[in-house]
Amino acid sequence: MKINVFGATLQAGVLAGLFAEHGHQVFWCPNELVREDQVHYQNEDVNRLIEQQVLSGFLHIGSFDELPLDNDVHVFSYAATEQDRALALLDRIHQIIDKPKGLFINGSTFGLHGTEQLKQKLNTENWAYLPDVIQEGNALGSFTYAKQVIVGVDHDAVKSMMQELLRPFFQFQHQYLFMPILDAEFTKLSISGMLAMRIGYMNDLALVSEKLGIDIFNVQQGLAADNRIGSAYLSAGAGFGGENFSHDILTLSNTVSDIGVQSQLLEQI
């Protein structure tokens, strides 16, 4: 396939590199406003993958004007605060192509109905939502070794397109968790909320343990030994969850408030 990737998020870099590694011709536009020939992340594995794929000729990094807009797949992966940029880009594409073809994927976390707002800019129903679940400390593995991939689709035809695109990474039917786009958007925010509650609880336990002279590490091990809980995200502290974690929590809290539901737990987070 020929794939366009727009945006400079860690998800954009991971997808651009991995798609190229699996033989797709990938055209990556990190910044549609100015030309950027290189993109550097704090994750050296991602940087190395990108460099290798550029040298192999499967990954091309360039400006918007250099991208062929008749490619098979178009991925939009912008930061949560860059929605206006994404919408402006789609306006620009619409001016060039009135009836776009191919698959359009929103990987950006713009909150509920974010994908719908992008969809309104282009005259096509072939939109999917691929939640950004890339972990900063495990960028490549968090995608390639995921047990299941959440995909938001509103049409069966798009479901087939997404399976074809992701088959190198997810070969079995049970690995796909398809749901309506709006459900997938809310699920993405809910995941961030659940992680925040878990780490917040551990922070509280750490404070109590310190007061009582208890080793929090022993408590963590005990919690991890219970298979209902598991070992993930049991370390007290901050700095986890990905690039847009804080924004996700705020968006989730605002969404709950906007529909008139009071959640003391979300407010505490």
Regions found by a protein language model. Give the residues of each.
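ATP-dependent carboxylate/acyl-activation modules
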Residues: 5-8, 15-18, 22, 249, ...
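Conserved N-terminal Rossmann-fold NAD(P) cofactor-binding segment
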Residues: 29-72, 80-86
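Rossmann-like NAD(P)(H) cofactor-binding subdomain of soluble oxidoreductases
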Residues: 81-139
